[in-house]
């Protein structure tokens, strides 16, 4: 088993939204960055993987097991941080430790308190006194403290200052040094994913638009800036999307080197994941 997670033709219909045949794989030892606008389908996909949303069609396998048939065994080995997951505010971090000891077979109190110390989280203070960033750190500490093989993280660095964010990213990178472990990381902070993700899956309006390695996206793709005259000479099969402004055209291309050889247009910008998202969503085919 080379893949720790496999999602095949996942579909789910709501009154005003539909997840349409979502498929992707997460190999062992890798970080997959899951990107898209709010409402694009990221959270529905994650909650389907976790069997929180279970009235879907398609197949999801985690650790080589069907997630519906093996829910309890699978969750024993998953560390979870959800954007809408909250601990009761009257509890303190020590209370969380007592609760988690009864939930996870492999709960490691020593490791948990080590993370609390690293994150400067007071053990005896009620969670209601914590800032948003402190609460997020507590969720991350909890997710890591039962020796999971897979981390599923929805906006894990939201609310963290740059120093704390870098600290958390370092912890995630340490986590996958064990080649049996992987991370599915959904985030709006695309610069984080540019540094740590091995794969990028881009979802929009319930459909997967791109699923590539990070290096392929950032090194091969590019945005060409050209005049209207130059744009009219470009074959429609040679670009993915374009945007027109008052003074120029911006054209998203899949292979900037090959494009430049063919058209000899030298104004090609290095792409970021944010650029890619904007062009894929706002650009014209």
Protein language model features and the residues they cover:
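ABC transporter nucleotide-binding domains
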Residues: 2-7, 12-184, 188-191, 195-196, ...
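Short loop/turn segments at beta->alpha junctions
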Residues: 92, 213, 269-272
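ABC transporter nucleotide-binding domain
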Residues: 169-253
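C-terminal coupling/interaction segments
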Residues: 239-285
């Amino acid at each position: 088993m080379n893949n720790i997670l496999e999602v095949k033709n996942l579909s789910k219909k709501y009154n005003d939204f539909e997840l349409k045949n979502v498929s992707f794989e997460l190999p062992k030892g890798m970080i997959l960055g899951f990107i898209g606008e709010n409402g694009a389908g990221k959270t529905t996909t994650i909650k389907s993987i976790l069997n929180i949303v279970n009235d879907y069609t398609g197949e999801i396998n985690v650790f080589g097991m069907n997630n519906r048939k093996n829910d309890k065994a699978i969750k024993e080995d998953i560390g979870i941080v959800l954007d809408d997951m909250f601990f009761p505010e009257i509890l303190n971090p020590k209370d969380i430790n007592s609760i988690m000891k009864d939930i996870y077979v492999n709960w490691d109190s020593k490791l948990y308190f080590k993370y609390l110390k690293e994150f400067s989280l007071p053990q005896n203070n009620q969670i209601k006194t914590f800032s948003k960033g402190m609460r997020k750190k507590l969720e991350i500490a909890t997710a890591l403290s039962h020796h999971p093989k897979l981390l599923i993280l929805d906006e894990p660095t939201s609310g963290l200052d740059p120093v704390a964010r870098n600290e958390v990213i370092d912890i995630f990178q340490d986590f996958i040094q064990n080649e049996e472990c992987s991370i599915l990381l959904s985030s709006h902070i695309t610069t984080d994913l540019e540094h740590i993700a091995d794969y990028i899956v881009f979802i929009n309006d319930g459909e997967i638009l791109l699923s590539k390695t990070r290096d392929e996206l950032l090194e091969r793709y590019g945005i060409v800036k050209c005049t209207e005259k130059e744009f009219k000479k470009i074959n429609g099969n040679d670009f993915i999307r374009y945007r027109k402004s008052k003074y120029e055209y911006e054209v998203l291309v899949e292979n900037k080197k090959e494009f430049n050889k063919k058209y000899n247009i030298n104004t090609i910008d290095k792409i970021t994941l944010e650029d890619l998202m904007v062009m894929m969503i706002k650009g014209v085919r």
